[in-house]
Amino acid sequence: MKKILILAFSLFTLGTYAQREVPQSRMEQIYEEAKTPYKYGLAVAPADNKHKIDCPTVFREGDKWYMTYVVYNGKSGLDGRGYETWIAESDNLLEWRTLGRVLSYRDGFWDCNQRGGFPALPDMEWGGSYALQTYKGKHWMTYLGGEGTGYESVNKPLYIGLAWTDRPLGSAHEWQAQDKPVMSIHDKDAQWWEKLTQYKSVVYWDKEKTLGAPFVMFYNAAGRHPETDLKAERVGIALSKDMKKWKRYPGNPVFAHEADGTITGDAHIQKMGDVYVMFYFSAFEPSRKYKAFNTFAASYDLVHWTDWKGADLIIPSKDYDELFAHKSYVVKHNGVVYHFYCAVNDAEQRGIAIATSKPMGRSQVHFPEREVKNRRMVMELDKGWKTWLCDKSAYGQADNAPTVVDIPHNWDDYYGYRQLTHGNLHGTAMYEKIFTLDNSLFPISNSSFGKRYFLRFEGVGTYR
């Protein structure tokens, strides 16, 4: 009898282990299903260079689509107060109208300066309703919060807060929130991988209780590995039966890339058949030439994840996302996949962009004009030059009367009976342009102003 029991247990163990890896063929199917090669452009962009927009969450209520996103009110990582959470609506997932705030700064609380929210309990089904489910008659939202000013945790650690509302989602109104965080790096059961700070969190309603509780929170946090001392951002899980009291999963972190400074974060999970798909972003990955990108992993049990080794889903490739193209929220509707992501350009302008599985046109939303930050300024000087011939030529007489031209310019028309390779007209011509440099474009603190100017001429006297 003992031998039979041991054999049965061994078979069960092997079967469980085999389930942990999602086969490559299935991963390729997921990639083909989710890829979005057509970049539509920006969906939401700041109106000025004193704000940055980040972290989209998209859901449906009735016949409208809604997007929450966070807004940072600073030009750099140090000069702003912090995050607030806003909401926008759309009829078609492409064109968005801003409605207003849902989580604002609140003085005198633990989260006075940071309130970046992420709506909870979304429908996890790929191509499903994308509605937010209610629990106890309320909609819920977890958020990264803190008292430190600046961009995210630049000055002080962030913790995880909880907010809710019983009002319609389609109106911009302030959500209620608890007076203290539900998760903190100072909790007695806080784990090594989250000891520095906590970041984005999303709560899913797993009614099958795969991990023993109905509410599963995926969150990313920063910490140092106790053995290697590698500092990185990793993804872990917390569980709850009532949305308010949370217990950390003992096997955390459940997903990470162990390279110093690497970020693995912002898990967005949907279920494709029997497989859970985690859309996530990675940054400063040594194997990539670009700095930040979106890709995916897959799992049968929410804990053991198989990383996709093929082409990334979203990478920097446009002038609006050339620095970072990261932080996924993916929706499939009416046969089209919409991949919302945070786009950051080299001027550090930050907004929400969309890529799609089918061509959907081009967005009319753009970042504001970039500010001149550097000591180097580029001016176009190709218009309005005066020019005149200075001497006799082989096939023409000098004419001292100037004429106004744009450069590149050539006096020769290449006509004439000889049709020489270098033209028929030979001699000397003068070109003159007077321009004024606007000193106001240079900051007063720029001590190099007035010392050096470089003019590069192209196309005067050239031929093709």
Residue ranges and their predicted role:
Residues 368-458:
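Extended carbohydrate-recognition surfaces in non-catalytic/accessory domains of CAZymes
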Residues 19-117, 121-199, 204-262, 270-323, ...:
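Beta-rich carbohydrate-recognition and catalytic domains
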Residues 9-17:
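Hydrophobic h-region of N-terminal signal peptides that target proteins for export
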Residues 54, 84, 199, 265, ...:
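Residue-level marker for the onset of beta-strands and adjacent loop->beta junctions
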Residues 1-4:
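Positively charged n-region of N-terminal signal peptides that target proteins for export
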Residues 462-464:
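Short, surface-exposed beta-strand/strand-loop-strand elements in extracellular ectodomains
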Residues 343-345, 456-459:
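Non-cytosolic beta-sheet module surface loops
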